[in-house]
């Protein structure tokens, strides 16, 4: 007899039939279906955070605060940073602030605050600024532009 596709068969014991649990005694895994005695864990798993009927942690601890998803994040820099890194008459942009390592992230918005003194005339382009910082820059003849 020659070997042909219709003659091929598996070696005995190579393929096992799937046991369908909980489908009656005749199926081989009926009644308790390998789950042991009756009880809570036989039914299904207990839900996440369940502590056996004790008042769970997330209900014992009081609620507090929330996370504002509309919050505007600014990277802050001060007039003292500008004083030490720029010459009189320079233009200060967000890109130049990043290149001079004043800002840590290139694409984050930046806000200028009035900490420190300024002795130079500068043109500053930024996303936001404090009124005190604007006043100090304009006193020295500089100007502020909002980007």
Swiss-Prot record:
Pfam hit, one: Ribosomal_L27A
Highest taxon above the source species: Bacteria
Ranges of Basic residues composition bias in the record: 16-28
PROSITE patterns for the chain: RIBOSOMAL_L15
Keywords from the named record: Ribonucleoprotein, Ribosomal protein, RNA-binding, rRNA-binding
GO molecular-function terms, A-Z: rRNA binding; structural constituent of ribosome
Protein's UniProt keywords contain Lipid metabolism: no
Family: Belongs to the universal ribosomal protein uL15 family.
Assembly behavior: Part of the 50S ribosomal subunit.
NCBIfam families xrefs: rplO_bact
Name the record gives this protein: Large ribosomal subunit protein uL15
Native source species: Mesomycoplasma hyopneumoniae (strain 232) (Mycoplasma hyopneumoniae)
